[in-house]
Amino acid sequence: MTADGLGCEANADAAYGWYEKALAVFHAAEEEKPWKYTEYRIGKMVAAGLGTEQDYLQAADWLTLSANEKYKYAQYSLGGLYYHGKGVEQNHEIAFALYTRSADQSFPYANFELGKMLRDGIGCEKNSVEADRRFKEAFLGFVFLEEKGHDDKLQYRLGWMLLNGVGTEMNETKAKEYFEKAATVGNPFACYQLAKLILSDEKIQPQEVEKALGYLRKAVEAENPYAAYFLGKLYEKGEHVPKNISEAVRLYTLSAEWDNDFAAYRLGKLYLGGEGVLKDVEAAIRWLTFAADRKNPFAEYALGILYLKGEDVPKNVSKALEYLKRSAAQGNQFAQYRLGKVYLMGEDVQKDITAALQFLTAAAEQGNQYAQYTLGKLYLMEKDIPKDKEAAVRWFTLSAAQGNVYAQFFLDHIDEFKDPSVLLAGTRLLHHMSRVFADNAPPLKPPGQRADRKLLRKLREKKQAQGHARDDYEQTMSL
């Protein structure tokens, strides 16, 4: 209560003192008579650094003692340490086993973690049926616990599951009710989600807008990075509030300082483009690097293009390729397309048709119309690879279906290009339109995907949590 300011003013020093006393009591009780509960409590406090220095290694030892006595709470907590590799060597299989032992004793939090692991195939084989069963058990368990204790964290979790249809039928109305309960006592995550729900209503009334903005500001005061980022986006775009880039930058900075890589990416973009702020390449690089270090694929792509072009920073092809490959490995179709073009043209690196085809195909299969168009030309021209008219038609068709008029041109005249020289003449006629395929092309919704689905889903969930639309790629093909 002293730490959280419940019933009194928050006082971290006083709270530490109380935790220290509590820890001493647990140690004394354990010395007198070893007990799984005290071992668990000591392990949790040491892991969190409550009343003592944080020490995951020591925490793992205490939790292991308790878990070996089949204490479900310790099994769950120890499973988390193994999952994240804190105090122990990371081992998803052991984490899965510990979560299973805990879940089999009807602990809903363990069931929830098992659901995620089974869904993603982490530490086990993918099993969507079993994942759904575990999620349903988790949901029912959370409902039971919430009815007994009316905990705001449980209310938020239940709202999230109802909103996303995890372990239960999707029900936005019920989700909103849970968020409202949690927001009443100031739960920052609930405040944030509730604000997003309110603002998503196309027929929203002015008084509701003010209510939503109030929830967002309340969440920002509680240092919620997602709320700060979302509110920053509203100010940047001038949605529901007067456009104010300075306020957007302030909120993005707060969010980034609270470790939000998307906010850091936006800051990098703003400072690099001088969009409403004084252009500051040094600050842009600093924030983009901050985001890239946290595996943000858009920041990795942005840095890759920067170092490849060498306009605002000294050209560094090696660095550029490193960042582009990191971004491409996370399924960024724009990075895949750019790498394909780099290896195809052989201007900054040794020409590598095999690598070019690999990256272009990866981008094309995600629906990148420029990669599809490029592949169509490659298969038709018979210059770097054997001619494959069927493949050319397939890629041109996919590109044209997205409105690519140049792909449509080739489809309309496909039989006229029997002689490569005629084809070359045709492409020269279209040369003045080639800027459409330059790096400033806007992203389009992909009809399919090839990249690692687990990586893409994690990124998508992370973006949606921060208020992005499902098909919002948060970037164009250039900076």
Residue ranges and their predicted role:
Residues R450, R457, E461, A465, ...:
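Non-Sec secretion/translocation targeting segments of pathogen effectors
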Residues D4-L6, V25-H27, E32-W35, E39, ...:
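Short helix-capping/linker turns of helical repeat alpha-solenoids
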Residues E20, A131-L140, E390-V405, F409-D419, ...:
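TPR/TPR-like (Sel1-like) alpha-helical repeat modules
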